[in-house]
Amino acid sequence: MSDKLLVINPEQKPHSRGTMVTQSLYEHAGGDDGLHRLEELFYEKALIDPVLRTQFTKRVPTHVDHLTWFTAESFGGPDRFTRELGFQYLIDVHRHLENITDEQRERFIAAYMEVLDEGGMPDDERFRQAFREHVEFGARVAQQNSRAETDADVYPLHEVPHWDWPDER
């Protein structure tokens, strides 16, 4: 048996017992550094985008960090968003936004997808699919919560959702 590691899939890494385990989306995206770079690019785009800038009216110094923490935790990284801010923070922030329109929700998704390459994110199909599904879900939840008039109208999610690789088809 050879001592060389056979890498079958770039999304896998060696397990300590010699078996292969799948890398988390967080690790695959480059961890905090990769996700922070991506969130910074998205945020810069949102601040000047004619459709999104009514929701992103001014630069908030902590916003990129909060976006990074949320995505990192969702993708299997540290639970910093939950520890530092608590999930209720996310609900409260979106409930105070002006009602998010369908056009804004769609543009939000498109803006994220547009910065993936510039942000140096992996271009494999499964990562891009997982990322798109994550952003689409988040945009739908944010839109619903922005329109909530009562607690009963808020999307019934009480913790940062954990995202994983899509099933192989």
Which ranges hold each PLM region?
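Core of compact, soluble alpha-helical bundle domains
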Residues: S2-R169
